[in-house]
Amino acid sequence: LFIFVSGYLFYLTRIERPMPYLRMIGDKLKRLGIPFLVFTMIAMVIKTRFAEDMTRPSSIGLQEFVHNILYPGEGPLSELWFLTAIGWMFILRPLWTWSLNGKYATAATVALLTAIHLYAPKGIEFLALSSAMRYVLFFYLGMIACKYRIVDRFAVAYKTILVIAGSIYVASIFLDFALLSALSGIALSVSLALLADRFVPQLFAGFRNYTYQIYLISIFVQVLVKILYKHDLITHYATGYVVCILAGIYVPVLIAATAKKLNIRFINLCLGLSK
């Protein structure tokens, strides 16, 4: 879903309203690369200091740092594979621009990316290549959804789509069909978002502009909650679970909003803030 949304936003901001290619690459390198390096180093320090509380402890050293950059899925913050994988997708903007100019080229690209998703080799951890090949289909579908205003069409019949997508999603679990599960899950999530927007339009207002910062920071907050629970400072699992979710959302939002207000360029770059 995150990859799909990224593709949607990429088309909206970098294809529909294009900027020069090299400038776009430089912008994405800053927005993805600097937080990637910073949060990798932070994770290495924390996981070394609290090694006894970590499922996957780390160590500090130049060789370890280089390995974590080249093999992000094996690093102390394995979730950062996403930044490397999506970086590959941004680099391919000329291909996306060309293929989206014609329906036959678009259909052929979808077919090719579907084949890559289903049959690409797994286990290539170097620069998250396997992950990039596996998820690029959803990135492209996100761009298609933006180009053809598919979400707007969903809004007309979101209740029907909600029922159909939900039924297909449940069926796909029993059928063990991962691609069908992913596609129906995306449709289900979009329908639920449209439902929420219809009845509770301000539900996501508090953090809608900070989803990237939630992604970057939330894991550290959740690790802290887990450490507190492990040392009996949070005594009930249910309490810890709720605190983990809420803190994982709103602590990053608080940090990002404060940084945005201070408007210190270095901090903004480290947190991936656009300004």
Predicted regions and their residues:
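Alpha-helical transmembrane segments and their immediate juxtamembrane cytosolic regions
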Residues: 1-275
